[in-house]
């Protein structure tokens, strides 16, 4: 759990913004959203595999674009 110390004479909205940023860095909201509903193991594997394919396609696309620019 991210903890922030409110500084002296610090406005509330600034402290809240720092807290939100620390929560975002810790990945709390993403974790809560992922665990909000039960996901069957087969669905989780399917989603992970699709994400891996998408990452690979993105990487290959970037490499091909780099090669084209070099010539």
UniProtKB/Swiss-Prot annotation:
- What are this entry's molecular-function GO terms? structural constituent of ribosome
Q: Which UniProt keywords apply?
A: Ribonucleoprotein, Ribosomal protein
Q: Does the keyword Translocase apply?
A: no
Residue spans crossing the bilayer: none
Which InterPro entries does the annotation name?
Ribosomal_bS21, Ribosomal_bS21_CS, Ribosomal_bS21_sf
List this protein's GO terms for biological process: translation
An example GO CC term for this entry is:
ribonucleoprotein complex
Q: Does the keyword Ribonucleoprotein apply?
A: yes
Any Pfam family from its record, for instance, is Ribosomal_S21
Listed PROSITE patterns: RIBOSOMAL_S21
- Family under the similarity heading: Belongs to the bacterial ribosomal protein bS21 family.
NCBIfam families, per the entry:
S21p
Record protein name field = Small ribosomal subunit protein bS21
Per the UniProt record, the source organism is Shewanella piezotolerans (strain WP3 / JCM 13877)
> What gene does the UniProt entry assign to this protein?
rpsU
